[in-house]
Curated annotation (Swiss-Prot):
Protein name: Carbohydrate sulfotransferase 10
Keywords: Carbohydrate metabolism, Glycoprotein, Golgi apparatus, Membrane, Signal-anchor, Transferase, Transmembrane, Transmembrane helix
GO CC entries: Golgi membrane
Organism domain of life: Eukaryota
Glycosylation sites: 99, 104, 325
Record topology, Cytoplasmic segments: 1-6
Length: 365
């Protein structure tokens, strides 16, 4: 009898302890949001074991990546299934492509110019469309290895990557119409995009400021031509001052006036053409659209989706190098008139919409 009452008493103490603990255990944490400090709050409680979770948390401007809570430990944040991310991107692409109000900004005839941008790996049935200033050099290295020119990406000389006579990467334009259609209809196709305005900044820095590959025609031919037509004050010596970003913005936003210069510049304009003009995403059915801002997660997904994950690795990506930098964008656009920025946005509006990059209201308003 005594043992019975001791057991009842012990059970009572356990119940009291559980009731007391359940009132105080309520775990909550934040997942980092966009660069402006917005965040999503997720709550997990011991009593109900429920998760307050949107299907995908999309940070503004692609500054980070979508997240879910870990199925193993609710206190751990991990990326969502990247297949769902890609499906969402393709759905967005399809929706915008069918929007007749911006049809002229999103559709391009699949002509030789576009086919020149697409590199072919017949061995593994892959097509890669080149969109400059989004890490294309590394993807070219991956294809060079797959084509058997080198055994690993680290062994490829930098000067060879862009030498299209020697790098072993055939362009789709070099093939017959029958071969082109067969590959477009059956091969794995992908390309990479980036916030349109940040990409323009990267192109400006790479070609007109740093010019690391020593391509003198950008500074000696293209820059002076833009300065002569678009610099509002000619008191400065154009040769010594060089091209300014505001000159570059005026040139890009001049819908009709730039056409003569574009013809004069030839294929060098690929570094600032729209993604629609380069890869015809509304007219070619791509399997994957990668984003520069989430390249750490996109790269392995692309390798896996193309069936080559065990054959080659994407070169390591320095932490944070692909992250969207709003401060840099604001700095470059400071001092540029609202009219010029709006004209620039009007040209790249199709790219912003196709790939779900938010309208840069902080620049336009």
């Amino acid at each position: 009898m005594r043992r019975h009452w001791l057991l009842v008493g012990a059970c009572g103490w356990v119940l009291l302890i559980l009731m007391f603990v359940s009132k105080f255990i309520n775990f909550s944490f934040r997942i980092p949001g966009d660069y402006a400090g917005r965040s999503e709050i997720f709550v997990w409680t011991l009593s109900s074991v429920t998760t307050k979770l949107p299907s995908v948390v999309w940070p503004e401007k692609g500054a980070s990546q979508p997240y879910i809570l870990s199925s193993v430990s609710p206190s751990v944040v991990e990326p969502i299934d990247w297949h769902l991310v890609n499906e969402k991107r393709l759905e967005q692409l399809s929706t915008v492509c069918s929007n007749s109000s911006i049809w002229n900004l999103t559709h391009t005839t699949v002509r030789k110019f576009v086919l020149d941008r697409i590199f072919v790996c017949d061995k593994h049935k892959i097509l890669f469309c080149q969109t400059p200033k989004v890490g294309n050099t590394q993807w070219k290295k991956v294809l060079i290895v797959l084509n058997g020119k080198f055994s690993k990406v680290e062994a490829i000389p930098e000067n060879l990557v862009h030498d299209h006579e020697r790098n072993g990467l055939p362009r789709l334009s070099s093939m017959t119409d029958t071969e082109i259609h067969q590959r477009l209809n059956s091969y794995f196709k992908f390309f990479i995009v980036r916030d349109p305005f940040e990409r323009l900044i990267s192109a400006f820095k790479d070609k007109f400021v740093k010019n690391p590959r020593f391509e003198p025609w950008y500074k000696h031919d293209i820059a002076p031509a833009i300065v002569r037509k678009y610099r509002r004050s000619h008191h400065d010596d154009s040769e010594s001052v060089g091209l300014r970003f505001e000159d570059f913005v005026r040139y890009l936003g001049d819908k009709t006036g730039r056409q003569h210069l574009d013809r004069q510049f030839g294929d060098h304009i690929i570094h600032w053409l729209t993604y629609a003009e380069l890869c015809a995403p509304c007219d070619i059915s791509y399997n994957v659209v990668g984003h520069h801002e989430t390249l750490e997660l996109d790269a392995p997904y692309i390798l896996k989706s193309a069936g080559i994950a065990g054959l080659v690795s994407y070169p390591s990506i320095p932490p944070g190098i692909t992250r969207y930098n709003r401060t840099k964008v604001e700095r470059y656009f400071s001092g540029i008139s609202q009219r010029d920025i709006r004209r620039l946005y009007a040209r790249y509006q199709g790219d912003f919409s196709l790939f779900d990059y938010p309208k840069p209201a902080f620049l336009l308003n």
